[in-house]
Structure formats: structure tokens, C-alpha cells
Amino acid sequence: GEP
């Protein structure tokens, strides 16, 4: 996923 996104950081």
C-alpha cells in the first residue's frame, strides 16, 4: 500500500 502507500507509505
Curated annotation (Swiss-Prot):
Alphabetical UniProt keywords: Metalloenzyme inhibitor, Metalloprotease inhibitor, Protease inhibitor
Single Gene Ontology MF annotation: metalloendopeptidase inhibitor activity
GO biological process, one term: negative regulation of blood pressure
Role of this protein: Inhibits competitively angiotensin I-converting enzyme. Administration to hypertensive rats at a dosage of 1 mg/kg results in a decrease in blood pressure.
Protein name in UniProt: Angiotensin-1-converting enzyme inhibitory peptide
